Structures are given as structure tokens and as C-alpha cells.
């Protein structure tokens, strides 16, 4: 069991006094994640801007755990909570999107994907319509190479600005990000703060039509009005995760308050009172049944974070304790 957030802040007494952002001990992550489940962050920090974030990183000893989250759309937090500091970039300091030249946009890491799509439409830049259908923020999109409708984040990235654990600035090229399917090999210790995107001039009517098609498709096939974290598993090579889940008889499968959506069975939903343990157990049960049915090993797309409650554990489907 982790100690209280107040105790952690007391240990750092004086180190954090000059920060302008908000420090909140023992904050429920169920208020942040779209699943509306999970234990508390020991301390939540919301920096005012990049300078404030840098000062925070320079003040916090590297042995103290630190986790960065965005708008919470792709996170499953375990019920024992998240030790150390959880950093959440605010829309006020990191959420702006601006056109910097004819074909380029700069976006803060806390900007919702939809805001980037809207800014691109206003600027007459094609190639960003897919963001209109992704329920997340740009920081997460950069980290996992988010994509939809056959387009990926890596196709639009010019460079990414980031801070390391020492608070130093780094500028990463597209190649530095090491993109692959739903993955970036950039150091997990880097905190992305903004990105420079490159688009292609296009007709606004065509861009708007593409965005409308994305939105219509999403509302037609995805449980957009449920408490969900988005796609649960990455698509295996040569097939779709939802097809394998369906073939294994897992559409609508429930564990406690967690369910694989009847509408789109690669989406886990919280039906009202699911715990983090319910959600993760359901996911591992689905992985086991798919493997038994087809020999395919599904890999989590949702990020699982934090500690189990005392006395709890979950076996991965191959019998390995996680």
C-alpha cells in the first residue's frame, strides 16, 4: 500500500514552493480516465506551462516515480492507485493549436485530437481528418502513433518538442520518434509538450466531407456514449482484433461491471460500477479465449497503469503474473 500524497509532499517540503501549477494529493484517477475507474494518484500535478513543468522536473528527485497522462482516453488504472507524481498537462498551458505557415500547424500535447482536425479544416489543410474520429489528445497520439481510417500520426509529424526527467528540452525529428504501428520508440522518460505538423493544401468542402464521414462511421459502429477507453487491443497482422474477439464468442462478455461492447467488441465499457480489476480481468479473459480459438495473441492497446490493491493480482492468459 502506498503512503499518502500529503506524506510525499512533506518529504519534498520547500522543493516545490516556486511552482505555479496545481499540486493535489490523493486524487482519484476515476475522475480523469474515460473508464471512470481506478485508484488514486498519490499526487497530481498540473503545470501551468512548459517552463513550470521544467522547474517541477528539476525539483523532483529521479527516484520518485512520475507518470504523464493526457485527457485519459486510453488508460486503465489499477485500483491500488499510482505511486509518485501523475503529471497532467492542462488545456490552458498545452492545449493551443495554431497555424505557423501555409502548410504547418503547431499543437500543444494537451490539445484534443478533434481540435487539431478543426484547426486544419479552418486552415484548409488536408490529411488531418482522421483525428476527428479519435477520442484522445495529441500527446497520446504522438506516443502511440494513433491512427484511423488508414492514416497515422507519423504521416503528419515534422518535429516534436519534449522535456526529459531533468527538465531539459529536446526536439525530436520524425525519424527520432521511431514510429511503427501503434508505437513510438522515443524514450518513455520524455514528456512531449508540443508538435509541428505538416499538412497538404486542400479544399475545405472536401476536408469537411471527410471529417463528416469519419464522425458518421464512428457513431455508427463505436459505443461513443459509453464509458470506454477506445480500442482495447491492437489489430493483429492480417486480421482485425474485433473479428477474432467475435469468433471467440466474447462479444458482450462481462466481468463484474466491465463488458466487451455488443456494438463493437474491441471496445471495453464500464457499465456503471466496474473496477480497474474488473476491466483488466475481462481483457485477459478475452486474450485467453482468442488464443485458444485461433492461436492469435492479442496485445493491449490500452495502457495499464498503477498498483493492484493489496491481495489482488491478475494472471495473464499465458499464466504469467503481471
UniProtKB/Swiss-Prot annotation:
Q: Which UniProt keywords apply?
A: Cell cycle, Cell division, Cell shape, Cell wall biogenesis/degradation, Cytoplasm, FAD, Flavoprotein, NADP, Oxidoreductase, Peptidoglycan synthesis
Q: Which GO terms describe its biological process?
A: cell division; cell wall organization; peptidoglycan biosynthetic process; regulation of cell shape
Annotated localization: Cytoplasm
PROSITE patterns according to UniProt: FAD_PCMH (PS51387)
Give residue ranges for domain FAD-binding PCMH-type.
36-202
Please state the protein's primary subcellular location: cytoplasm
> InterPro entries from the entry?
FAD-bd_PCMH, FAD-bd_PCMH-like_sf, FAD-bd_PCMH_sub1, FAD-bd_PCMH_sub2, MurB, MurB_C, MurB_C_sf, Oxid_FAD_bind_N
Q: Which reaction does it catalyse?
A: UDP-N-acetyl-alpha-D-muramate + NADP(+) = UDP-N-acetyl-3-O-(1-carboxyvinyl)-alpha-D-glucosamine + NADPH + H(+)
Highest taxon listed in the record's lineage: Bacteria
Which EC number(s) are documented for this chain?
1.3.1.98
Q: Which cellular components does GO assign to this protein?
A: cytosol
Which coenzyme or cofactor does it need?
FAD
Question: Known Gene3D superfamilies for this protein?
Answer: 3.30.465.10, UDP-N-acetylenolpyruvoylglucosamine reductase, C-terminal domain, Uridine Diphospho-n-acetylenolpyruvylglucosamine Reductase, domain 2
Function of this protein? Cell wall formation.
- The protein depicted here goes by the name UDP-N-acetylenolpyruvoylglucosamine reductase
- The gene that this protein is the product of is murB
Amino acid at each position: 500500500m502506498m503512503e499518502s500524497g500529503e506524506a510525499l509532499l512533506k518529504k519534498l517540503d520547500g522543493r516545490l514552493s516556486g511552482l505555479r501549477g496545481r499540486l493535489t494529493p490523493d486524487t482519484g484517477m476515476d475522475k480523469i480516465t474515460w473508464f471512470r475507474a481506478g485508484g488514486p494518484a498519490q499526487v497530481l500535478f498540473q503545470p501551468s506551462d512548459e517552463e513550470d513543468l521544467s522547474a517541477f522536473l528539476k525539483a523532483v528527485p529521479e527516484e520518485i516515480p512520475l507518470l504523464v497522462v493526457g485527457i485519459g482516453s486510453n488508460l486503465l488504472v489499477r485500483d491500488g492507485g499510482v505511486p509518485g507524481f501523475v503529471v497532467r498537462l492542462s488545456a490552458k498551458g498545452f492545449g493551443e493549436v495554431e497555424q505557423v505557415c501555409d502548410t504547418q500547424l503547431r499543437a500543444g500535447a494537451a490539445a484534443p485530437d478533434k481540435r487539431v482536425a478543426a484547426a486544419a479544416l479552418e486552415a484548409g489543410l488536408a490529411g488531418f481528418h482522421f483525428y476527428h474520429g479519435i477520442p484522445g489528445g495529441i500527446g497520446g497520439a504522438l506516443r502511440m502513433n494513433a491512427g484511423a481510417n488508414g492514416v497515422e500520426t507519423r504521416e503528419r509529424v515534422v518535429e516534436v518538442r519534449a522535456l526529459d526527467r531533468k527538465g531539459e528540452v529536446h526536439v525530436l525529428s520524425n525519424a527520432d520518434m521511431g514510429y511503427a504501428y501503434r508505437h513510438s520508440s522515443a524514450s518513455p522518460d520524455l514528456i512531449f509538450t508540443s508538435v509541428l505538423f505538416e499538412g497538404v493544401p486542400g479544399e475545405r468542402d472536401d476536408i469537411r466531407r471527410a471529417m463528416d464521414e469519419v464522425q458518421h462511421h464512428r457513431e455508427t459502429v463505436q459505443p461513443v456514449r459509453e464509458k470506454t477507453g477506445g480500442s482495447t487491443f491492437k489489430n493483429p497482422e492480417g486480421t482485425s482484433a474485433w473479428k477474432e474477439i467475435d469468433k471467440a464468442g466474447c462479444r458482450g462478455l462481462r466481468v463484474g461491471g466491465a463488458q466487451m461492447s455488443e456494438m463493437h467488441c474491441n471496445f471495453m465499457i464500464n457499465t456503471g460500477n466496474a473496477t480497474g480489476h474488473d476491466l483488466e480481468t475481462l481483457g485477459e479473459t478475452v486474450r485467453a479465449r482468442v488464443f485458444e480459438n485461433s492461436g492469435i495473441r492479442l496485445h493491449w492497446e490500452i495502457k495499464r497503469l498503477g498498483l493492484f490493491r493489496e491481495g489482488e493480482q491478475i494472471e495473464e492468459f499465458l499464466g504469467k503474473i503481471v
